[in-house]
């Protein structure tokens, strides 16, 4: 394995993350050194908050252009409160955020054998040249890897019928009724299943860093790039296995030292 140590940064505003279970999962799976830290955004140079705020995006149909943040926006970053459930979500360019974070990793920890995995509530998005718009993303791979808990909830789509029913009536009452009807079929905020699903994304981050291969096209694989919540819950909670091809590359990785 190229990686000799994984440093994973928790997101303290998301209490569903069972960081100790995740740590154990990583140690048991990869038999490598794992260190858990409370948050990437604690004990870091104050400059970072201005830089992070400048990666905000406001227009979904335009490629990234650097935002000049207001004092209030910088203050919001400093506080790192969970705003993911607000109506007005703050969106960030995932690759720009990744670049920013990488600059704040101490030099002695910038080592290709040390993989940094940052869990965050920030909603990361990437601009897609094929349809010329931003899409929410749960995982921004490479080193550091960013995994967005809000992205896990927002990026894979809910059932089509859910949106159709909502289209007719947006009232709070109707929304609650529909949420009840489809309960369990997709991840919600404060969903206790989030932590286990996170393990799958962490696996994807590690495998991507080790092999350079992004995602899998096979729905029976934990590396599957789920477009629908239903697929996500199937591949990460029910099936929980690699396809035969990735089972083999996983074995190879853990047997190299
Ligand atoms: Zn696969």
Regions found by a protein language model. Name each.
Residues 1-137, 250-257:
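N-terminal low-structure segments adjacent to metalloprotease catalytic domains
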Residues 197-209:
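Catalytic glutamate of the conserved HExxH
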Residues 6-13, 135-193, 210-257:
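Metalloprotease/metallohydrolase-associated module, dominated by Zn2+-dependent proteases
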């Amino acid at each position: 394995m190229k990686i000799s140590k994984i440093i994973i940064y928790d997101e303290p505003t998301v209490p569903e993350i069972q960081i100790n279970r995740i740590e154990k999962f990583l140690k048991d799976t990869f038999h490598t050194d794992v260190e858990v830290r409370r948050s990437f955004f604690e004990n870091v140079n104050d400059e970072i908050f201005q830089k992070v705020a400048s990666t905000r995006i406001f227009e979904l149909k335009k490629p990234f252009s650097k935002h000049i943040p207001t004092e209030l926006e910088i203050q919001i970053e400093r506080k790192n409160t969970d705003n993911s459930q607000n109506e007005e979500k703050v969106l960030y360019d995932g690759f720009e955020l990744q670049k920013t974070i990488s600059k704040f990793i101490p030099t002695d920890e910038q080592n290709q054998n040390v993989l940094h995995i940052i869990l965050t509530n920030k909603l990361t998005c990437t601009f897609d040249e094929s349809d010329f718009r931003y899409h929410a993303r749960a995982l921004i791979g490479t080193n550091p890897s960013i995994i967005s808990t809000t992205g896990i909830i927002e990026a894979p789509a809910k059932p089509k019928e859910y949106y159709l029913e909502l289209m007719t009536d947006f009232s709070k009452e109707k929304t609650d009724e529909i949420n009840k009807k489809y309960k369990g079929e997709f991840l919600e905020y404060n969903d206790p299943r989030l932590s286990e699903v996170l393990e799958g994304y962490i696996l994807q981050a590690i495998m991507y860093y080790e092999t350079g291969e992004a995602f899998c096209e096979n729905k029976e694989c934990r590396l599957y790039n789920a477009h629908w919540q239903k697929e996500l819950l199937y591949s990460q909670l029910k099936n929980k296995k690699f396809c035969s091809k990735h089972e083999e590359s996983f074995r190879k990785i853990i047997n190299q030292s």
